[in-house]
Amino acid sequence: MFVRIRDYNENLRAVRFCRRPKDSAKLRILAKDNIGVQDFLTSAGSYALRDLVLPDAFCVRQIRKNPQIDIFGKTHLTELAGFVTTRVLKDGYSELGGFGRNPHGAQYPCRGSSSGSAIACAAGFCDAALGTETRGSLMMPAMANGVFGFKPTRGAVSRSGIIPLSSSFDAPGVLSRSLSGLKTVFSAMLGKDDSDPQSFVPSELRKKKFNGRTLLFLVSSGDYAALNTPAVRRFISALKQGGFHIEFRHAPMAEFDYKIIS
């Protein structure tokens, strides 16, 4: 992997820093450069933050408890995880990293903001990579670069030690070329963090009783067809079996304004 990074990273612009991965590690992973990793600087792609030193984020500390996983570097990203500019820029661009490139071909977009993490996974630079999502920042680059991406429920993974974009929407997650790698890294990230008010342990929810509680789903005009898919029907059935009362209401599409969420 280190050799692949050396040979191809200058063209793909995925990795900001790295060292040789540990030989003993079974999963060699990279972290998006808005996530604190004490071994490397953390910039969120911003020239203004180029020399910022952060301690390990909570999720990184949790991962380090698993000796089979080695965090050996940082990936480039869309600057500040979402452009703060009056200019229209390409997904995956940052002042420090330049323009990321999809390894499947320059004619394909890399998307963002976890662009470097997705590119690195697709190019074989790592087994998995950490990313963050505020509005599609994990899922869109995963789809564009042909890798698996997982955005957990907000609070399932602590946000402590991560440069924020929107406290209402930010969620750390994982990208990987394999589902097994994704599952292993995600499981290692879990843990209750008292410094993050949204933090919870997913397994503890199974112990709670939800009888009589109502879950309201807001559905836009273009999403009604999805309600009849087998996967969604199974999901709704499981919620009802868990004691929830389910309601659906129409929600008109809101005018897009990225500033609202940040």
Q: Which residues make up each language-model segment?
A:
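Flexible, acidic loop-helix segments that line cofactor/substrate-binding pockets
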Residues: 202, 213, 249-262
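Amphipathic alpha-helical segments in well-structured domains
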Residues: 56, 147, 232-236
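A short helix-breaking turn/cap at a secondary-structure junction
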Residues: 14, 151-235
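Acyltransferase
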Residues: 227-252
